[in-house]
Regions:
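Basic, flexible Lys/Arg- and Gly-enriched helix-loop patches that mediate nucleic-acid binding at interfaces
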Residues: 1-168
């Protein structure tokens, strides 16, 4: 959930995702990160090979986000789905679809294939959009379980684990 640091311990004393899974019975770690002000799907595992496979850019594992933005969305859409760079490095083109709009805030679905630091927020900023909320809803073929409340977790099903292992 928002307000948690995606790490196992924090020298500043902030809440960590490790506290959320302390009762799982294994030592697990996060696969990738979510920003402190982001929310949604976060995979935790004790499998180093799976972690490396999902994080390695050559595997192009999809990460899908719902992003609530303000700004000129019409102008931003072709920028977001076209060739972009972050820190001088080219990004794989994102898949972007426009969703609902309410009160000047537009919901976008953005699928990326890399996991650079604050990538979606920085892409939106480059396109002239301000992100008001960001929620990861999918990694690879595994989607956020909408029955879970923020901070809750569950083990992967055999089918979900098999889908993730395809990237090995």
């Amino acid at each position: 959930p928002r307000g948690y640091v995606t790490t196992l311990s924090d020298e500043k004393g902030r809440k960590t995702v490790a506290a959320l899974v302390s009762g799982c019975g294994k030592r697990v770690w996060p696969v990738g990160r979510l920003d402190l002000d982001s929310e949604g799907f976060l995979l935790m595992t004790d499998d180093g090979e799976l972690t490396n496979s999902l994080l390695h850019p050559s595997h192009q594992v999809e990460k899908e986000y719902l992003v609530w933005v303000t700004g000129d969305v019409e102008t931003a859409l072709p920028i977001l789905s076209g060739p972009m760079e972050l820190d001088g490095e080219p990004l794989a083109p994102a898949k972007v679809t426009r969703g609902r709009e309410s009160g000047g805030v537009t919901q976008l679905s953005i699928t990326i294939y890399q996991g650079k630091n604050r990538q979606v927020r920085r892409m939106c900023a480059q396109a002239g959009l301000e992100v008001t909320r960001l929620k990861r809803i999918r990694e690879g073929q595994v989607s956020l379980d909408r029955k879970l409340k923020p901070g809750q977790w569950r083990p992967l099903t055999a089918q979900e684990l098999a889908a993730l292992r395809k990237h090995l």
